[in-house]
Amino acid sequence: MNLESPKVTIEKSAQYLFDSLSDVKNFETLMPESIAKFEVLGEDAFIFGLKGMPEIKLKMKEKVAPNKIVLGAASDKLPFTLTANIDSVSENTSAVQLFFEGEFNPMMAMMIKGPIGKFIETLAGNMNKL
């Protein structure tokens, strides 16, 4: 299952966004208001929970400065990645788009497609708060 957020233009440099997203504690700023839990688990991982959803642990998987950051599920039960692609538009402007890729059975995919789609849209929409 592949989902993508709308591309969002931010008045920050690509390097600034990359550095901000490289620090996992900054993801709390991006979370939707319906967040029930957010906890940093070391330098490269965090766990979060949204109301009515199971808690999810994310771990930093890959960083390619200043254009790409990949987070992945720390559990193999629900394997997925969340990738942030950062494009430099000008010296102080960037475009960010989030991509969610996961391997789920059709029933699970049907249940989570809506909530996950809204979730990555919210994360992208909150990028200007960084």
PLM features: residue spans?
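Amphipathic alpha-helical hairpins
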Residues: 2, 8, 30, 69, ...
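Beta-strand/loop substructures that line and gate deep hydrophobic ligand-binding cavities in soluble
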Residues: 74-125
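A short, structured loop/turn motif at beta-sheet edges
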Residues: 14, 61-66, 86-95
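Short acidic, gly/pro-rich beta-turn/loop elements at beta-sheet edges
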Residues: 16-18, 56-58, 70, 81, ...
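Soluble, non-transmembrane catalytic domains of enzymes that act on hydrophobic metabolites at membranes
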Residues: 2, 62-64, 79-83
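Glycine-rich portal/gate segments that line the openings of hydrophobic small-molecule binding cavities
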Residues: 29, 38-77
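Hydrophobic ligand-binding cavity/cleft-lining segments
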Residues: 1-39, 45
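Structured catalytic core of nucleotide-sugar glycosyltransferases
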Residues: 4-6, 58, 72, 84
